[in-house]
């Protein structure tokens, strides 16, 4: 049962991060296409947003380890 809980935690964390990263990058590309002169600022904000979204799978892995070994 612990193995299933760990797999679900990691899977949902990765799924959410993948969807979030896709949305962030697609909106950034749309913004750069509309205003190419704002590309540098948009790219910086994109990487900050991706870093925040990628924190969730890391937390999911920690929760999975706690569920598996705890």
Swiss-Prot record:
Site for Reversibly protonated during proton transport, residues: 54
Membrane topology: Multi-pass membrane protein
GO BP of this protein: proton motive force-driven ATP synthesis
Principal location class: membrane
InterPro entries in the record: ATP_synth_csu_bac/chlpt, ATP_synth_F0_csu, ATP_synth_F0_csu_DDCD_BS, ATP_synth_F0_csu_sf, ATPase_proteolipid_c-like_dom, F/V-ATP_Csub_sf
Keywords: ATP synthesis, Cell membrane, CF(0), Hydrogen ion transport, Ion transport, Lipid-binding, Membrane, Transmembrane, Transmembrane helix, Transport
Annotated GO CC locations: plasma membrane; proton-transporting ATP synthase complex; proton-transporting two-sector ATPase complex, proton-transporting domain
Subcellular location per the Swiss-Prot or TrEMBL entry: Cell membrane
Highest taxon listed in the record's lineage: Bacteria
GO molecular function: lipid binding; proton-transporting ATP synthase activity, rotational mechanism
Residues spanning the membrane: 4-24, 49-69
Function: F(1)F(0) ATP synthase produces ATP from ADP in the presence of a proton or sodium gradient. F-type ATPases consist of two structural domains, F(1) containing the extramembraneous catalytic core and F(0) containing the membrane proton channel, linked together by a central stalk and a peripheral stalk. During catalysis, ATP synthesis in the catalytic domain of F(1) is coupled via a rotary mechanism of the central stalk subunits to proton translocation.
PANTHER family assigned: ATP SYNTHASE LIPID-BINDING PROTEIN, MITOCHONDRIAL, ATPASE PROTEIN 9
Subunit and interaction comment: F-type ATPases have 2 components, F(1) - the catalytic core - and F(0) - the membrane proton channel. F(1) has five subunits: alpha(3), beta(3), gamma(1), delta(1), epsilon(1). F(0) has three main subunits: a(1), b(2) and c(10-14). The alpha and beta chains form an alternating ring which encloses part of the gamma chain. F(1) is attached to F(0) by a central stalk formed by the gamma and epsilon chains, while a peripheral stalk is formed by the delta and b chains. The F(1)F(0) complex interacts with SpoIIIJ and YqjG; YqgA is found in the same complex.
Similarity remark: Belongs to the ATPase C chain family.
Protein's name according to its UniProt entry: ATP synthase subunit c
Gene this chain is encoded by: atpE
């Amino acid at each position: 049962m612990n193995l299933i809980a760990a797999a679900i935690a990691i899977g949902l964390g990765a799924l959410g991060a993948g969807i979030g990263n896709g949305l962030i990058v697609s909106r950034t590309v749309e913004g750069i296409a509309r205003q190419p002169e704002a590309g540098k600022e948009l790219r910086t904000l994109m990487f900050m947003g991706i870093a925040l979204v990628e924190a969730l799978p890391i937390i999911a892995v920690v929760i999975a380890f706690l569920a598996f070994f705890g």
